[in-house]
Amino acid sequence: GSCADPDIVPFNAGDPGCGKTEIWRTLQKKFSFIKIINGPQLSCDGWKGSYHVKDIFLEEKPQMREHMIVVVDEADKLFEPMVGSGGTDFSRSIQNEFLKLIDGDQVTFVNEDNRKDPQTAKIDCRNISFVFCGSFEMLRNNKEDRSSAIGFSSSTETADLTSEVTEEDLVLYGHIRREIAGRID
């Protein structure tokens, strides 16, 4: 059986310190299949950086790799555009790597820690779920500031932050690729 429904990608947005990560830490103590990662630490395969997307899986026991809930903490910072001096948008590249995983594809990772004998790991991602947590401040501020004017006098209505965040909100203000945003509930 599966530990979660991989077709649902939950999204948790809230102020820093409101308990988004703490909820998952508490659940992680009870359920070993929950893995929390720090989004801004991630870098793409082949780039400099201490933690790559493939490391999420390679550091796990083989029997755990294909049945996990991966909680990406501070995902909003991971999704913000990060353009290098050569014009490469690193955020988009990382999102491309996540898209393969979220799609439930079979992915092969190469562990090159031992350069003389690199190990490969083929992972079936169908039973892996992802959760994106972060403050998503720009997205929340935009939803909060939406107003409507009626007649000659304007009345401002503050959007209920518990209201549904649309796919368009995620794309425009969360900087999330449409292919990923369409899978977020």
What label would you give each PLM region?
Residues 1, 54-60, 98-107:
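Short, well-ordered amphipathic alpha-helices
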Residues 2-3, 62-63, 120-122:
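Surface-exposed acidic, glycine-flexible loop patches that form ligand/cofactor-binding
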Residues 2-37:
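Walker A/P-loop
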Residues 7-11, 67-69, 129:
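Residue-level preference for the first positions of well-ordered beta-strands
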Residues 13, 22-26, 31, 76-185:
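Canonical AAA+ ATPase core
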Residues 17, 45, 62-67, 87-94:
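Conserved P-loop NTPase motor core
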Residues 35-68:
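Short glycine-rich substrate-engagement loop in P-loop NTPases that contacts/grips substrate
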